[in-house]
Amino acid sequence: MTFRRLAIIFASTASVAVLAQAPQEPDWKKLEDETMRHYQAVLRLDSRNPPGNEVVVAEYVKGVLDKEGIPAQIVGSDPKRPNLIARIKGNGKKRPLLVMGHSDTVTTDEAKWTHPPLSATRDGGYVYGRGTIDDKDNLTAGLMTMLLLKRLNVPLDRDVIFVSESGEEGSSGVGIGYLVKEHFPEIDAEYCLAEGGGVTRIGGQVK
């Protein structure tokens, strides 16, 4: 559930970023409605990969961030398949935290869908659409986390970076591969919150 993911990511961000003081309590009901509005909006944007066309998601997210006064830039090797990088500054005591979600989805066989895959239909307590759990839920949660940090003027001991990544579904050369090669200083962080991840354990020790 996206709103639950938002709460988890916001709490994780607050914990890792080390708040200088507790933020004021937000209006969670209004936030739930706003989260759903952005969630459905990005689900209705066709970024199925191939061909990708993640630019529609990057532009939507940038528009939301711009209205909140959060600095964001769209960068990429392909104008139709860019990434977005946004940053909220902390006091610099610690290295940044990176929050990521990818904006592309896999393709669809529409004949197998109860509701159209780009409809973001709410039915029976569920939201139906391509990308609902991979990965536009995390993308929306990351976006809302940035909005909350900004609106509540949360004091942070580290910068929080948000990335909307293109090309995760099998074509990472335009996404994280490009970002690491061309924009690493802007995404360099101590920790990353994303859909994936893992550790290597050797002799019972995590390496």
Language-model-derived ranges and their functions:
Residues 17-18, 39, 44, 139, ...:
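A generic alpha-helix preference that emphasizes hydrophobic side chains
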Residues 22-132, 149-158:
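Acidic/His- and Gly-rich active-site-bordering loop/insert found
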Residues 1-3:
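N-terminal secretory signal peptides that target proteins for export/translocation
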Residues 11-13, 113, 155, 186:
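A generic structural signal for short, non-catalytic loop/turn and secondary-structure boundary residues
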Residues 126-127, 133-207:
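Acidic/histidine-rich catalytic neighborhood of metal-dependent amide-processing enzymes
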Residues 7-17:
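Bacterial N-terminal signal peptides
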Residues 5-6, 22:
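Positively charged, low-complexity intrinsically disordered regions
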